[in-house]
From Swiss-Prot:
EC number(s) stated in the UniProt entry for this protein: 3.1.15.-
Pfam families from the UniProt entry: RNase_T (PF00929)
Known role: 3'-to-5' exoribonuclease specific for small oligoribonucleotides.
Main location: cytoplasm
Residue stretches making up the Exonuclease domain: 7-170
Organism: Pseudomonas fluorescens (strain Pf0-1)
Taxon lineage: Bacteria, Pseudomonadati, Pseudomonadota, Gammaproteobacteria, Pseudomonadales
Entries under PANTHER family matching the protein: OLIGORIBONUCLEASE, MITOCHONDRIAL
MF term (GO), any: 3'-5'-RNA exonuclease activity
Residues of the signal peptide: none
Keywords on record: Cytoplasm, Exonuclease, Hydrolase, Nuclease
Top-level taxon of origin: Bacteria
Localization of this protein: Cytoplasm
Protein name: Oligoribonuclease
Amino acid sequence: MQNPQNLIWIDLEMTGLDPENDVIIEMATIVTDSDLNTLAEGPVIAIHHSDEVLARMDEWNTRTHGNSGLTQRVRESRVSMAEAEAETIAFLEQWVPKGKSPICGNSICQDRRFLYTHMKALESYFHYRNLDVSTLKELAARWAPDVRDSFKKGSTHLALDDIRESIAELQHYRKHFIKF
């Protein structure tokens, strides 16, 4: 059910860090309520790209996405970037009105740069604000390192796992760092 207070969490896996030269190879979304309770998990989509595109990945991306099985899923996928974008928007329309939720995640500005370059309709679905968990991580590192260090991430570098970790990390900071 649509609610303007719901939050949209997104994570992208890419072939690199430059949106002008690299591409999105996996995306996932989760919608939570304002108290960070998961309401729905959206589609987890491996986006097809040619072997030529995948061959341009640097060593870190080649190793990481190869070890996780993502590279093979991308090769086997028949979903285009446009189809992935449309499927994700269709999911989000069920839960959050356009322009209401900030884009939520970890280091989310990087994901937003890729969306702006490769999926403009999806990027414009979000409010212009960002809810970036990495901001709290940086503040905790400076003001309460024990709080930051007490949260351990698994870092599978798969989109859905990364979103779940981002939500859990924000829940951790809410409980142990933000005083209200």
